[in-house]
UniProtKB/Swiss-Prot annotation:
This is Centrosomal protein 15. It comes from the Eukaryota. It is found in: Cell projection, Cilium. Keywords: Cell projection. GO terms for cellular component: cilium. The keyword Aminoacyl-tRNA synthetase does not apply. InterPro entries: CEP15-like. May play a role in ciliary assembly. Pfam families: CEP15-like. Its main location: other.
Amino acid sequence: MTSLFTQEIRLSKRHEKIVSQRLMLLQQMENKPEDQNKGRASQTQAAKAALQRNVSLLKDIEAAEKSLQTRMYPALPPEVAALETLYWASVEEYIPKWEQFLLGRAPYPACSENGNEAEDTIPKRAQQ
């Protein structure tokens, strides 16, 4: 009988231990969503802060790039800018004439009487 009584006490203690572990696990399960929400909130806040920092850094980099470009490539004098505009207009005008030749589909484009079509056109445009 003593052995049954001892066994009963041992089982009772084990039961209490299991019940206390269960209670502890239930409390952890209840606290886990709260902890996860806190973790998500802190992650969201950190992500927003990182985004603001990145936007600020990007603006600083763009400003530095613009500053360097103006130092490296100052504005052209108006005469040079006008010549550049005339040059690119001339190039765009002659592209269709030369395109087929460059692709190997047509003969060399015919030039003006003196042999250089560009020499005739550029002074005329500069006078306009």
